[in-house]
Amino acid sequence: MWGRRAAALLVVLACVLTPVPVAAAEAPVAHIDFGGLSRTYQVHVPPGTPKGLVLSLHAGGQTGAQQAALTNFDPVADQHGYVVVYPDGIDFSWADGRGASVPDRTGVDDVGFLVTLVQRLSADFGIPPGRVFVTGLSAGGFMANRLACERADVFAAIATVGASLGTNVGCHPSRPVSVLTIHGTLDPIVPIGGGPMMGRGGASTVLAATALVDSWRHLDACDADPLIEPQPGVDAQFVERVSYRCAEGSAVVYMRVDGGGHTWPGAPEILPANQVGPAIRSFSASEAAAVFFDEHGR
């Protein structure tokens, strides 16, 4: 498995996205009523029979459509056979448990909404059990971690960028969940070393990237010795991939990007570089996530 994963990783590192495209034909907005609210989302369907479903969660202040454009995940999903759903958060954010967003403070049940959404789409598209995944940037990544903590029965793996978990958020998954976390050392929004941070919705305190990895290693009953793979970088950046084998075929993988900012690897900065740090151009996070999901379904 690890030999195949290493070969697949070379494909990831060779695939670097171009700047965010303007969608030629944006998917129509769909609606679902949940918790007394009309929630919106967009769906991308690959050609052929889908192999899985990816829930892609936007950053704070963004929308599902902007997440689709930023990550350019649709063509990657077509290659890997994934239906992708891009939901919209209330007040452009998520109830990720930190208490630092409008959805959190007003009691929005985003866990329930997102689980209901993927269960409906799984039924609509015949998605096999164990082939539902989550990826997210920033606040979307925080929400992905919360989903893994609370609904490991639904989500087999997550892949996050520039995100962690609030120190006040309990994590008690019912079974192992594979986790890929990507973090830049020059991220000025979500500090790689953890501690206090100020987001769009207010202040919170978050786990350091290494503490998040250690937490998932413990929860997933991982081996003590990791596989460490330095990767080539660009723009004076250096990427180190640290992988742990874990229970029930799961894995915990940490990609630290020395010199990287609060950006989706393979895409431009979502805000000016002086606000979010340097773009990461040495690999595609979308391709990395898809390969990780390919390998870590149930």
Predicted region positions:
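Active-site rim elements
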Residues: S101-R105, G195-T205, P272-I280
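Bacterial N-terminal signal peptides
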Residues: L9-T18
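Short beta-strand/loop motif that positions the catalytic acidic residue
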Residues: T181-H183, D187
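Alpha/beta-hydrolase fold active-site loops
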Residues: K51-V54, V177-S178, V252
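Serine-hydrolase catalytic machinery in alpha/beta-hydrolase-like enzymes
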Residues: A27-V45, T49-F133, M143-R146, E150, ...
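C-terminal catalytic histidine-bearing segment of alpha/beta-hydrolase fold enzymes
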Residues: I182, L207, R217-R298
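A domain-start/cap signature at the N-terminus of enzymes
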Residues: W2-R5, P19-L53, Q79, V83, ...
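Acidic catalytic loop of the alpha/beta-hydrolase fold
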Residues: D187-V190, H262-W264
